[in-house]
Amino acid sequence: MNIHEYQAKEILRKYGVPTSTGLVVTKTEKINETIDKLNTEVYVVKAQIHAGGRGKAGGVKVVKSKEEAKKVAHDMFGINLVTHQTGPQGQKVNRLYIESGCDILKEYYFSIVFDRLASCITFIASTEGGVDIEEVAEKTPEKIVKFSVDPATGLQDFHMRGIAYELGFKDNQAKQMKEIVKSVYNAFVETDAAQIEINPLIVQTDGNLLALDAKITFDDNGLFKHPNITAMRDHDEEDPLETRAANAGLSYVKMDGNIGCMVNGAGLAMATMDIIKLYGASPANFLDVGGGADRERVKEALKIILSDKEVQGILVNIFGGIMRCDIIAEGIIAAAKDIGIKVPLVVRLAGTNVEKGKEILSNSGLEIIPAHDLADAANKIVEAIR
């Protein structure tokens, strides 16, 4: 789960991280009133969307008067902001964060992430912070340093010293950086975050460090422990189909292809998407119905897939362990009778009650294309949509 910048800063401040502060606007009629509350010489108007690259896309504006700030805010509110992370459709700006500007001496990059390959928490830092960190990673990766934290021992003083040293901080600034590292680590662990990113972390002209922008992504599996964080979720920033799927207990991610997939198990789902690509087509989604899906959940899964207008065919790939193939078959038939399936449907079943499931589908009278293995299923669905 992602949250907005102003929410991320609120969390970081609770853990002792110094951040820039401002006011949030959620309605156009509140823009002037909100800006009037800020007494500053420089105003920074920031679009609040769940995507990076706002600065380059015009979603962050720095102005030097109240009048300019009001005009920029009114112009920015409600637009579709297109960045390299939103895709061509962009993301509608429904919130603004308006801050007081500050003097910047130098910008740095600092983040903490759970490294799944190394099975540990990893700090990532660079002396080249700001909007071009992606370019730094591509062209000059040697300017980016990493420190891994052994989960058995946790954060140690040498991690904090090492990060401060690699960023070139000395004396009081090194002390400040060590405290920021410690605070960010505590926030990361205690909130079950998947990533915390501060970009840029700046040195002000007075020598103090400040988090000028912040992003936090949380592990969805840990949200049940944090109702206060769950309450920060902005459904307007999420795909409606993904939200609908989550409410039904389904794992769904929309993609750009034209073949809808319904599978049980994340690994099998990824293998299914891979083989669709191998046979020359593209998956329209990732959809894992889970191991304990019932007839209604299967029915809802198919409805969600068919809600995507780009879907030209559906591949159902089920390996029945806990999940019974006859339940899948009944769900498919129920969905077909309820909403009608007007695109080619290929079904591959294996495992528990597979013969019963195949019999149910065969006797349904529906135009269902059976497949005996995954390669056969992928080949048949790709051929069916051509």
Swiss-Prot record:
DNA repair among keywords: no
Self-association and partners: Heterotetramer of two alpha and two beta subunits.
Chain positions recorded as ATP binding sites: 46, 53-55, 99, 102, 107
Keyword Cell membrane: no
GO BP field: succinyl-CoA metabolic process; tricarboxylic acid cycle
Amino acids binding Mg(2+): 199, 213
InterPro entries, per the entry: ATP-grasp, ATP-grasp_succ-CoA_synth-type, ATP_grasp_subdomain_1, Succ-CoA_synthase_bsu_CS, SUCC_ACL_C, Succ_CoA_ligase-like_bsu, Succinyl-CoA_synth-like
NCBIfam families: PRK00696.1 (NF001913), sucCoAbeta (TIGR01016)
Broad class of enzyme this protein falls into: ligase
GO terms of molecular function: ATP binding; magnesium ion binding; succinate-CoA ligase (ADP-forming) activity; succinate-CoA ligase (GDP-forming) activity
Protein name as catalogued: Succinate--CoA ligase [ADP-forming] subunit beta
EC number(s) stated in the UniProt entry for this protein: 6.2.1.5
Catalytic activity: succinate + ATP + CoA = succinyl-CoA + ADP + phosphate; GTP + succinate + CoA = succinyl-CoA + GDP + phosphate
Organism: Rickettsia felis (strain ATCC VR-1525 / URRWXCal2) (Rickettsia azadi)
